[in-house]
Amino acid sequence: IAQLPPGPGVVVRSGGSSGGSRCCAQPSLHLDRSAAATAHWLTGIGVDPASTLLLNPLPLAHVSGLMPWWRARCWGAGHQQLEPGLMKTPAELLAFCQGLPTWGKNPAVLSLVPTQLARLLAHPDGVAFLQRLQLIWIGGAALPAPLADQARALQLPLAPCYGSTETAAMVAALPPDRFLAGEPGCGDPLVDVELRLAADGALEVRTDRLALGCWRADQPERWEPLRDGDGWWRSGDQAALTPGLQIAGRIDGAIHSGGETVFPEQLEQRLMAALQAASLPVSAVLLLAVDDPEWGQRLVALVGSSDPAVLQRLEALTRPWPPAETPRRWLLCPDLAPSALGKWQRQRWREWLKRLDAAEA
């Protein structure tokens, strides 16, 4: 507590996708700046921020759930929290929203993660709900290509975006018209943001709303500033600027297999696209690295299914892949799912794999 800066603010937990976790200190002023930049973006696409109804299905303890409420507070807009149970029952969700006083009158804006979008798209009432929205910000994880194609076919106003706890949420967003025209990625930086790439391809961000510092869960007494001497923060995400922002995956998630650098997150997206094209009943795929005496590291695939026949089809689908990108093991894991924020808790599933190996030893 003594290390916290003076003045009002919040301490918000970040991380989880690569096994790490830390808490970031964000002054209230930084959250205000973030809300102002997002309002500027909305105005640029013809939406009056003050007129919006912000629907929020994300936890308030995370920046992705905190910021819709904070934006509404700054803009004088409406805010409605959506309980987790509603997001899993699209018929009840649609009925609930139809009962809101401003539903159908004010432009409804929703923040989602890809997992939530997929669940809604799988149900007619979920599709009906999504089609009533003015704007759908989608972030927290990569948007799989099949999901994007499905949203475009339904003419859903998706706005893929990128941000983090460290940046007080959104720093780049793709307008819905460009998304519907087929443009990939997360669009251009917001008005108060600069983006660049480090020599190794890592995305770096400079903005006046970067967190003042953070603590790691395993070193709570150590305060870590985020900025370098020139004000840049290294995100740890592999990216391209072409010119819009394209996120390839976590640099710290890359593995080295047989002399090749492999990004499991990219391969997971390819696998899910192949699974959808083949109409295979798989809820998710997660690739984990294990040590290998010959290759250095090899991939093990956890597959969200209970059908052994699916594994045979997956092996056949990936047979043409380069050896470094091809999993050496395929394991059924019916309970496989990301967190409520759509992020993979890879350390949790590594522990699951260790327990499985120990039981089979």
Label each residue range with its predicted role.
Residues 26-41, 53-119, 159:
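AMP-binding/adenylate-forming
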Residues 189, 199-230, 250, 260-262:
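Conserved ATP/PPi-binding loop(s) of AMP-dependent carboxylate-activating enzymes
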Residues 207, 231, 236-325:
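AMP-binding/adenylate-forming catalytic core of the ANL superfamily
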Residues 288, 300-304, 316-361:
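Conserved C-terminal "lid"/linker of ANL adenylate-forming enzymes
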